[in-house]
Regions:
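Accessory cap/linker subdomain of secreted extracellular hydrolases
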Residues: 287-367
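Conserved alpha/beta-hydrolase
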Residues: 205-227
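Short beta-strand/loop motif that positions the catalytic acidic residue
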Residues: 368, 374-376
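Alpha/beta-hydrolase active-site loop
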Residues: 235-256
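N-terminal cap/lid segment of alpha/beta-hydrolase-fold proteins
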Residues: 138-177
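Short solvent-exposed beta->alpha transition segments
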Residues: 32, 39, 54-102
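Short, surface-exposed "cap/lid" segments of acyl-processing enzymes
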Residues: 175-209
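Conserved alpha/beta-hydrolase "acid-adjacent" motif
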Residues: 381-387
């Protein structure tokens, strides 16, 4: 399960506080930035850098859930970020985009350890409605050896309609006759069509690999990525995942190159957890594949992730470990129903987490009259071999069920060795 964002989980490992003054970070006064959106974004970053968290918090849109971008949360986040990446060395005016009434500024920022994009969402009156830390442009894609780029072509498509239309692409094999088709459903967070995480693009690997073998694959940018600022703070799984996945399946089924009787769904992480429900709702799939889909009770999964990360912190008294322990207490309170609905935990309000906790993917899969394939990486500490065991226990002996463990693969199904970490 990956809903606690990579940024949030990595942040829990961080300890130090940014002390460097702003100095010449901008190379110019922020008031000289190209437009009012950049000026507002750069001025806000300057407040964070100067330690003026109360003032920074006062510029946050009142519609943002309590506990998300308040002064205390901003202070903790900025301290965590600097401890992970070192001192902030420079920022510059960034690209400005619009999504409905919101304006998104992608500010390039250089830290000692690496560069990233500080993505700030602004309202028309220049209040802050969103803050994300996005990896800088990944390195050029190096296709795996199993991909034959001459075996398929890519066709741009649009999933759904306004106001939530999503750009996507179908990898179409260059074969005669209708071919099988697969829709890929992302994990949590504002993922792009490739499910890009650092230098990894697991969904492009899958799409191009399957297309090389004669299978059409549809992948698309997630709603929370394309329309993030317009998505309600009370968004649920229906709006975040299920509705768009069903629309994508319908789109692929209607394409002339694809055999409508051989449409499959492949979900990763949160997408894997919801894959059986999406399959049940669609009613016409030929099969479902689950990659790294947790089967344990959600709060057990979340607590397990946090405890694992805490175990990587050698000093039990370090600020990072103290923050982890505090978050574990918060999770316990959330499980007990003691967190108000408007309070954000790990970037989402408590009702969201309760909705995730109510999902029982194994029970739903057991009721599907179609094949189910479950794949799991042995180095994955988010979805683990315990989850795979529960899938097997619930579905073993059922016609069409298969499972496979890949001992050396992580949550993204990339190879590795040694202790797995969030990095």
């Amino acid at each position: 399960m990956a809903r606690p964002s990579r940024q949030a989980l990595l942040a829990l490992l961080l300890t130090a506080t940014l002390m460097n003054p702003l100095g010449d970070l901008y190379g110019q006064d922020p008031t000289l930035a190209a437009d009012r959106w950049n000026r507002a974004a750069l001025e806000w970053i300057q407040l964070l850098q100067n330690g003026s968290f109360e003032e920074a918090g006062s510029r946050v849109d009142p519609a943002v859930p309590a506990g998300a971008l308040g002064a205390a949360e901003l202070e903790t986040l900025w301290a965590q970020l600097s401890a992970q990446l070192g001192a902030l060395q420079s920022v510059s005016p960034g690209q400005v985009g619009a999504s409905g009434p919101y304006h998104i500024v992608r500010v390039p920022a250089s830290f000692e350890a690496q560069s990233l994009i500080i993505q700030i969402t602004l309202t028309d009156d220049l209040t802050i409605s969103g803050l994300y830390f996005v990896p800088a442009e990944p390195p050029p894609y190096d296709p795996p050896a199993y991909i034959d780029q001459d075996a398929f072509e890519e066709v741009e498509v649009t999933v759904g309609n306004e106001p939530w239309a999503l750009p996507g692409v179908v990898s179409v094999p260059k074969l005669q006759g209708p071919v099988p088709g697969v829709v890929l459903v992302h994990g949590s967070g504002p993922n792009d069509r490739d499910e890009t995480i650092g230098g990894s693009r697991p969904f492009r690997d899958l799409a191009w690999g399957l297309a090389s073998q004669g299978i059409a694959v549809l992948r698309y940018d997630k709603r929370t990525r394309v329309h993030g600022p317009r998505v309600s703070a009370t968004i649920g799984l229906e709006e975040e995942v299920i509705e768009d996945a069903l629309l994508a399946l319908a789109l692929l089924r209607d394409r002339p190159e694809v055999n409508p009787a051989k449409i499959f769904l492949l979900g990763h992480s949160l997408g894997g957890i919801l894959a059986p429900e999406i399959g049940r709702r669609d009613g016409g799939l030929a099969g479902v594949t689950v990659l790294a889909g947790s089967a344990r009770p959600f709060f057990e999964v979340l607590t397990g992730q946090l405890e694992y990360i805490a175990s990587l912190e050698e000093d039990p008294n370090s600020p990072a470990r103290v923050q982890l322990d505090s978050l574990l207490v918060t999770v316990e309170r959330m499980q007990a129903g003691e967190i108000p609905d408007d309070e954000a935990v790990l970037g989402a309000p408590a009702p969201y987490w309760r909705e995730v906790a109510a999902v029982d993917p194994v029970a739903t899969a057991a009721g599907l009259p179609i094949p189910v394939l479950v794949l799991q990486g042995g180095r994955d500490y988010q979805s683990t071999t315990e989850d795979l065991a529960l899938w097997v226990k619930g579905l073993e002996g059922r016609p069409g069920f298969e499972s496979k463990l890949y001992p050396n693969l992580n949550h993204l199904f990339g190879p590795g060795s040694g202790t797995a970490t969030p990095e």
